[in-house]
Amino acid sequence: MDEPSLDIEGFEPQEPSSSSPGRVLRDWILVVVVALSAALFVRVYVLQQFYISGPSMETTLFENNRVLVNKLSYRLHAVHRGDVVVFDRITTSGGVIAHDDLIKRVIGVEGDVVEVKGCKVLVNSKIINEPYLDKDMLALPSLTDRCRVVDMQPITVPKDQLFVMGDNRPESFDSRSFGTIPEKLVIGRAFAIVWPFSKIGTL
């Protein structure tokens, strides 16, 4: 049986055409636009890095720490007690609206009754376990030095609201001062420290 043959008469290999400078530039512009769009999408809807300013969350977080915040968390499930959250606190002064991103720990959710007795935080009449509080702070002889607000009357957390507090109770401006916050103002859940490298870890 004859083997099939390939007629290559008149066949001339072609040199690959080199891309024109204009085409290369267009390709690079497309790559940059796609990369920037993806980065913007992630920052707006998925993950964002936040910089810690102030001592209100010590000793969990310190000034100049950087944390990653998951913006998808609360689209998938409810806010839980103990979560560390970043939220937008809106204030008005002289007709000017100001936005300030704060980071605190969730103490009470919708329907919870939160109170403070002798610096002990109670939720639904039970003292909550708070292993994240600084032991040196808890050992201070003065209750005021330990927590600033020694006693607080019971507060029932309204629908779609949260009661939040900083871990550094003497230095934190939180729901003990400005009341509960709307859950819709929560930006996301802080879940990891990414700076400094020596402190990298989950929250």
Protein language model regions, located:
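Small-residue packing motifs within transmembrane alpha-helices
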Residues: V31-A35
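Soluble "head" domains of membrane/secretory-pathway proteins
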Residues: D2-L25, L30, F41, Y45-Y51, ...
